[in-house]
């Protein structure tokens, strides 16, 4: 029966590799602490993921849909698609920077209005394992998940929204964490400048710095781009 798993894994990877390649800089990656990694994504290089990791990604998307439904039945007027049935998003810099958001909260029931001074709100949802979830619930998004923090700040900037309700599902206990995050114009500008810097470097055939020149650095060893990063080992 192990052969079934092997066939399944191979087909999942094959399907992933057959999908249309991204030809823009995704906002979800701009906050990463390795500029070289972000640049490789922008340049269309493909990260290497195991079938198990790809399944985990898919499970996360399904769980986010479930969280959205829980929120709707609890009094949130949450929209995850626009009037054309497409995911909310934006495109800027002549299509070189794009973002797609989980949703917008346009209103809430009366018992929830005390928590939200204005609408609409950006809604962004993540699924986290227990330890990561606990850390975020204790210290907040900005300190524990800088990539996600950059993501929501840029979303708010480009969609002209003043607040984001960040929601995290604990995949081990089903607990939910909510954090109301205000728009920070300085942070958004800083991340936007970083995106422009990466695009310009690629246009000039310049390499952005890697987080480490040592391929044995723990983040490099876990990176899906470890086999295509030209800086490592130089």
Regions found by a protein language model. Name each.
Residues 1-122, 129-131, 142:
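Metal-dependent nuclease catalytic cores that hydrolyze phosphodiester bonds in DNA/RNA
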Residues 79-80, 122-124, 163-168:
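A structural signal for short, well-ordered beta-strand segments and their strand-loop junctions
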Residues 125-127, 225:
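Residues immediately flanking
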